[in-house]
């Protein structure tokens, strides 16, 4: 049933997918793969508060779940709660220090806070792990552009 729900979500049949995730969770409330997939589907539907609650439920079951930490972080980032998002990414990095996605996401939040030098460090670290990681490449380029424009304004 979980695979069927995932297929529905992939086909953007979100409401039907949520119904199946709920069926799985009704019989097994601690099924973390279902919680994570449901949270991601709710996030795609724009139901961010429900998604946030679902990620928190997954983290109650497993506080070191990397997918839940990243998902929760991206929701916080979208709400402009960048410091809180960074806490989620830092928690993920404590568990898995060479985690390109967590580094790139942290870089994005740092960039939004105007901490471009720190953001650039995160993007570069992410790219040493995965040189083709699009989010890190785009973030690095944007940070470099912004730093260059700041320097040109000073002179």
Each PLM stretch: what is its role?
Residues 1-27, 33, 37-44:
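Alpha-helical segment of the N-proximal tetratricopeptide repeat
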Residues 9, 43, 70, 74-77, ...:
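Position-specific recognition of the canonical hydrophobic site in helix A of tetratricopeptide repeat
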Residues 32-33, 66-67, 100-101, 134-135:
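Helix-start (N-cap) detector for alpha-helical repeat units in TPR-like alpha-solenoids
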């Amino acid at each position: 049933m979980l695979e069927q729900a995932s297929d529905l979500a992939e086909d953007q049949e979100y409401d039907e997918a949520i119904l199946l995730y709920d069926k799985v969770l009704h019989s097994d409330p601690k099924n973390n793969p279902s919680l994570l997939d449901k949270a991601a589907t709710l996030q795609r539907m724009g139901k961010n508060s429900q998604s946030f609650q679902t990620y928190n439920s997954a983290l109650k079951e497993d506080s070191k779940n990397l997918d839940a930490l990243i998902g929760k972080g991206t929701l916080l980032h979208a709400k402009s709660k960048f410091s809180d998002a960074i806490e989620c990414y830092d928690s993920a990095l404590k568990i898995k220090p060479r985690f390109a996605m967590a580094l790139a996401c942290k870089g994005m939040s740092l960039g939004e806070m105007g901490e471009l030098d720190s953001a650039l460090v995160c993007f570069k670290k992410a790219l040493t792990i995965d040189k083709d990681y699009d989010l890190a490449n785009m973030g690095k380029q944007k940070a470099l552009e912004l730093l260059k424009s700041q320097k040109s304004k000073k002179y």
